[in-house]
Amino acid sequence: MQYTEIMVRYGELSTKGKNRRNFIDSLGRNVRKALHDFPELKVHANRDRMHIMLNGEDADKVMGRLKLVFGIQNFSPSIRVDADMDAVYETAIAMVKAQFKPGMTFKIYTRRSDHQFEYDTNQINDMLGGQILDHVDGIQVKMKNPDIVLRVEVRLNGIFLSSETIQGAGGLPVGTAGKGMLMLSGGIDSPVAGYLGMKRGVDMEMVHFFSPPYTSEQALAKAKQLASTLASYSGSVKFIQIPFTEIQEEIKEKVPEGYLMTVQRRLMMRLMDAITRQRHGKAIFNGESLGQVASQTMDSMIAINDVTTLPVLRPVISMDKTEIIKIAEDIDTYDLSIMPFEDCCTIFAPPAPKTHPKLDRSRSYEERIDVEGLMARALAGVKMTEIKPGENYLNTQEDVFAELL
């Protein structure tokens, strides 16, 4: 059917009271960003719902984008007709017939903001219900949990009909909770952490530590591809790559093997603290899950968090690996994450890292390296890229083959 509008219903915005307008404005901006390449669209974000006027654009493609926008509870493709009951009958019958299968039931739900229209909501329900019963053989009325809900909205600019409700992504509009910085490795966990933070309204920027020649260009491209996948939920993301080679080499040379990982992570956290403050962020996010590996014990977290006063948020902290993998599969990051390109966290990993490092020793071993100079040179080499949904950074088959040779 040729839809004319998509009606969007908000998610958790109803809980925000006097801040509701700000949340709706943020959602409107995010929707416009997600639909930027549909030039004929018009987006009207009103208090109760959002109306997206299609003006001839492809409804299916638009709805595919809307499914990924946080802050949307659900939405319905709609058809506008003139304020004439014969036109309403014709369109409603066609809508119901398109969905009807033997044994199905229906009900009608009418809202009327144009109180000058000649019929009230009960009259519209009765008249339209009678027409559907007369023209759709075998259909029955059911007021509770029907198969088809025909929604009718009588507005000043016409009557809008819809019979399909599509679930949105839920959550809060990206940006309403402030800016966060994600430590994005090439693994399974950190993209899931980023997704979960974005779902709670965080404007997430992606920070990746890059250690050439120990890590390959394919590993960097893989991280950018993960960022592009996550950008589908916000419209675009900033990707920040930090050179980490010199830091890793000096740590390996001067720090005992058991504390290599701890001191390395302390330097990463120092750099994250600096970048987050430069970018006016409010928190650091990572994909640590309690007790999975040596860097993720509580003793390790104490030793690593020691270098920052910013909140370090871990959205997957209590999840099992199977739970994390399930989300990664759902958001299309899993297949990318398991591609065989090593990141900087694995290339210098010692065979037996300390699972319960001591804070005083961590500080003492870190003093053996030139923290100030190393950080200054790393920050001077930072590169930033704006990444949009659908951008291709990784020619999967060719790059995997080349890496394995």
Swiss-Prot record:
SUPFAM superfamilies per the UniProt record, alphabetical: Adenine nucleotide alpha hydrolases-like (SSF52402), THUMP domain-like (SSF143437)
One GO BP annotation of this record: thiazole biosynthetic process
Lineage: Bacteria, Bacillati, Bacillota, Bacilli, Lactobacillales
Protein name (record): Probable tRNA sulfurtransferase
Domain THUMP: 60-165
Catalytic reaction(s) noted: [ThiI sulfur-carrier protein]-S-sulfanyl-L-cysteine + a uridine in tRNA + 2 reduced [2Fe-2S]-[ferredoxin] + ATP + H(+) = [ThiI sulfur-carrier protein]-L-cysteine + a 4-thiouridine in tRNA + 2 oxidized [2Fe-2S]-[ferredoxin] + AMP + diphosphate; [ThiS sulfur-carrier protein]-C-terminal Gly-Gly-AMP + S-sulfanyl-L-cysteinyl-[cysteine desulfurase] + AH2 = [ThiS sulfur-carrier protein]-C-terminal-Gly-aminoethanethioate + L-cysteinyl-[cysteine desulfurase] + A + AMP + 2 H(+)
Alphabetical list of PANTHER family matching this protein: TRNA SULFURTRANSFERASE
GO cellular component: cytosol
